Amino acid sequence: MLWTQAAAARETLSYLDRKGIDAEPALLGAGLSRSQLSQDDIGVSVASQYRFLELAAAEADDSLLGLHVAAEMDLRAIGILFYLGETSPTVSEALDNLARYSKTANEALVVAILRHKDEATMTIRRVQEPDEPPRQFFELLALWFVRTLHLQTNRHFNPLRITFSHARNSDLREVHRFLRCPVDFAQAVDSWVLPQRVMDLPIVSEDSRLLRILTAHADDLLERHPVVCQITSGKAQPQLLEDFAEGRALFRQVSGE
């Protein structure tokens, strides 16, 4: 069984609750419980998360649920991957860290960065194909990625294009409105293509000392057996990130930022 920290499922459950939509049928259908998703130290199977998002979209009668969740979610919910990016010096190095440490959040995905003269492409491939296309998950992930880059660079720019491996025949105009770039469906791979100039942008909150601490923790997570990682990483990670946030706030207060 492949494991995920289930940030997408937790954020989707929170979204349904805020909108007054009954999440229990989707939870039951995915083999999940509210108590599981209320605890950050419990991971779930990747297949269960995919299934929950698809069932939640059906319950909400919202074919764009993943995008709607991503538009409102706390970007930090993804955990250590967000903070690895936030403390990196440039977008290029932030994406390298995302690719290197992606399995700390989701064992089912392989992330790669391909660099060309005028553009760079981040691709995501699945270790194994799910029973049904995880459309909501990957659309949520796409908007999370774009919003995170905007926040961490304090710049608003559009990807050159985004591709999804799943098909979509409806609400295409709305998808483009959210992602603000050409989007192609039913492609060989899920990918985000950025101009090379974006790769060179600085991360406004770059912090080399904190990055070293975070990468050491992430390296430790990668070295653990998946079962151990599932049980323990969630317990250590929230405290580390809480300490990180408090330390950064104190630093800004003292330095007058």
Show the residue positions of the predicted features.
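DNA-contacting interfaces and partner/effector-binding or oligomerization modules
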Residues: V110, L114-L201, S205
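Short, well-ordered alpha-helical segments
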Residues: R10, S92, R135-L143, S208, ...
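N-terminal low-complexity or simple alpha-helical regulatory segments
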Residues: M1-M122
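Hydrophobic alpha-helical core bundles mediating ligand binding, dimerization, or RNAP-core interactions
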Residues: L53, A142-F145, A218
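Surface-exposed, interaction-prone regions with an acidic/low-complexity signature
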Residues: M1-A8, S14, V127-Q128, P134, ...
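Short hinge/gating elements
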Residues: G79-G85, V127-D131, M199-D200, D219
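Short polybasic/polar patches that bind polyanions
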Residues: D17, L28, A58, L151-T153, ...
